[in-house]
Amino acid sequence: MAELVVPYPLEKAQKIVDSVMEFDGPTPGEWWGLVIADPTTHAFMGNLAVHLADHGHSAEIGYALCVQHRGKGLASDATEALVNALFARPEINRVEGSLHPGNIASAMVLERLGFVHEGTSRQSYWVEDVVSDDAHYGLLREEWSAWNDGAATRPTVVELAEITERNLDDVTTLATHHSQRRFVAPVYRSLAQALIKPLHKGEPVVPWYRAIVADDTVVGFVMLSDVSPTEPHPYVWRLLIDRAHQRRGIASKVLELLVADRIAKGDTKLVLSYMPGLGSPEAFYRKHGFIPTGQIDDGEIEASLDLKS
């Protein structure tokens, strides 16, 4: 996943085309390419690449889009089609890809398809005289099947349950996508802060936290800083949905449950904050009525929801 430089050097492009045309399809030990083209005009928009290894049992993929075609979902659609085609070959058990750790857009493409961040190798990727880190993602056949089976299925029941010894292990193993970690802290940190309470205006906060359960499965975690002498309104401190259960409408249902609970308790406002940036939950919260207050808290944008309206 790189940004395709336009215009690409003609001599290099011709060498790539010549090498690809030697093969009818993905061939072990060789790179093979596909063109992403406009279905109507056939104009070139980008390309896909595949390299088979381990006697054809593993595939490394790459993708690139012309700058003017980015941000339209084309990379996700094309890469999904490629991954599905690869796993349609029964001998392939693993598909992997690598990218620059700062290329959040490319990371999100792989994460949407179920790829797992497997680590980052330091200063391992060279482009001429420039070296950078390389983030590695992988997807196994069994994970691909489970990901597709669970995609877009909305749960029948979503509940907020107390965390007990019986569900603690399920709660502490919840995880977001790797690219989302800059927006929400892991559960273990949240539970630690519930135990060792941070101070707000000189007073310890009052944590309120629950496991998010969808159809009897623990799928997320939510924590509020409750009303206190220094906190006039409940503050949504953490909202985390496990990577395997996102895009199922669960977070929206959690907000609905929180709003109903807080209205019943007489609260008039619900407050939260978020970091801006690619992949930020900002659009999600705005969609649900949270309006920026104009306050910035430690680099995060504060927003509130009026519970009286």
Where are these regions (language model features)?
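GNAT-family acyltransferases
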Residues: 1-68, 85, 89, 123, ...
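Acyl-donor (CoA/ACP) binding surface of acyl/acetyltransferases
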Residues: 33-156, 231-309
